[in-house]
């Protein structure tokens, strides 16, 4: 039996009942919205707690039946058959509840900023950067999320030397946050006459999209420069100084945006700057806890090689969890749920292990 926090579970049930009663009483619209939000957050865990309590009661009844010699032998045989199934259900519910009670990442529900930069490998790395962007774009489409490119630098033979985009939707960051790191590709370039396999790489960074309430940027801490722009992806040439470069003086972070509208560029650049500063704060807080972290998943080390895409073998390997899938074509079409779910499960398992050590 797992060491479940029974008092906390009872408190959650009590709070859930209180919210139900207050919502039924017809509160003001703004109060109702807040209550509904908390209700939807508590509902899954309270449902599991109630299922768990029913299963515990069922197991207790079956054990009492087995111990009572006055009970009909046939009934006791049935109880003996049912009890292992109920105990198995209890174990599954215990694990489900533990996961639902894990500390929540406040950024999980946010949209995300996706940054992909070509690394070693020249034009082949830029092509791979383009392939990765397309993979995430398709994954986003599969989930009903919106993708908008904020800035892009095209590779000489196609793809991207660098591309920055927003992915907007509920829970985007929770699904993509373990994608940060170095992605390596092994394949034969189209220009390679000898059929030799080349290795190149691209770096992916996924940041939670920060809002103004998340991070304060003082006017005196930034310098804004305007310059001539060739537009995102080189699609057009502006004759006005519309491109914007914002430098955050305390951190040295530089962000550029080069759409047609200077006003839009400033807003987009500030959006990326806010997210990078917010991410920097999160990284600092994470590093303070990293001495206790056992799992590589979620370490946020963007210099770490996390995944290899081997095209000749049709193989994808995630090195953090030693997961190998022979589904490269499907993954490059955006079907990355199996890897995303495995990484999330591994991270949750490491959190549970840490809680067990602290108990």
UniProtKB/Swiss-Prot annotation:
Name listed for the protein in its UniProt record: Peptide chain release factor 1
Pfam families: PCRF, RF-1
Post-translational modification: Methylated by PrmC. Methylation increases the termination efficiency of RF1.
Lineage: Bacteria, Pseudomonadati, Pseudomonadota, Alphaproteobacteria, Hyphomicrobiales
Subcellular location as annotated: Cytoplasm
Region of interest (Disordered), residue spans: 282-306
Biological role stated in the UniProt entry: Peptide chain release factor 1 directs the termination of translation in response to the peptide chain termination codons UAG and UAA.
One Gene Ontology MF term: translation release factor activity, codon specific
UniProt record similarity statement: Belongs to the prokaryotic/mitochondrial release factor family.
Domain of life per record: Bacteria
Chief location category: cytoplasm
Alphabetical list of InterPro entries matching this protein: PCRF, Pep_chain_release_fac_I, Pep_chain_release_fac_I_sf, Prokaryotic/Mito_RF, RF-1
GO cellular component, one term: cytoplasm
């Amino acid at each position: 039996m797992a060491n479940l926090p029974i008092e906390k579970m009872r408190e959650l049930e009590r709070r859930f009942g209180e919210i139900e009663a207050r919502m039924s009483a017809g509160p003001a619209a703004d109060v109702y919205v807040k209550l509904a939000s908390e209700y939807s957050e508590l509902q899954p865990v309270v449902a599991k707690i109630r299922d768990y309590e029913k299963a515990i009661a069922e197991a207790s009844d079956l054990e009492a039946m087995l111990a009572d010699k006055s009970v009909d032998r046939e009934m006791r045989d049935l109880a003996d058959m049912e009890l292992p199934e109920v105990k198995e259900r209890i174990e599954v519910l215990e694990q489900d509840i533990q996961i639902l009670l894990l500390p929540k990442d406040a950024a999980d529900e946010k949209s995300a900023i996706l940054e992909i930069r070509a690394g070693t490998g020249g034009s082949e790395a830029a092509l791979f950067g383009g392939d990765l962007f397309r993979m995430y774009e398709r994954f986003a489409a599969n989930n009903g999320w919106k993708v908008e490119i904020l800035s892009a630098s095209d590779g000489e033979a196609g793809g991207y030397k660098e591309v920055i985009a927003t992915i907007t939707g509920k829970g985007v960051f929770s699904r993509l946050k373990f994608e940060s790191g170095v992605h390596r590709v092994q394949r034969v370039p189209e220009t390679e006459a000898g059929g030799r396999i080349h290795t190149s790489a691209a770096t992916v960074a996924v940041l939670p999209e920060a809002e103004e309430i998340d991070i304060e940027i003082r006017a005196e801490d930034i310098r804004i420069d305007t310059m001539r722009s060739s537009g995102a992806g080189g699609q057009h040439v502006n004759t006005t100084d519309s491109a914007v470069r914002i430098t955050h003086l305390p951190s040295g972070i530089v962000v550029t945006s080069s759409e047609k509208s200077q006003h839009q560029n400033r807003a987009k650049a500030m959006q990326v700057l806010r997210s990078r500063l917010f991410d920097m704060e999160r990284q600092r807080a994470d590093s303070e806890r990293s001495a206790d972290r056992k799992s590589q998943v979620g370490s946020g080390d963007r210099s770490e090689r996390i995944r290899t895409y081997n095209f000749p073998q049709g193989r994808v390997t995630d090195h953090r969890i030693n997961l190998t899938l022979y589904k490269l074509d499907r993954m490059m079409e955006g079907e990355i749920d199996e890897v995303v779910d495995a990484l999330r499960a591994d991270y949750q398992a490491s959190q549970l292990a840490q809680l067990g050590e602290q108990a």
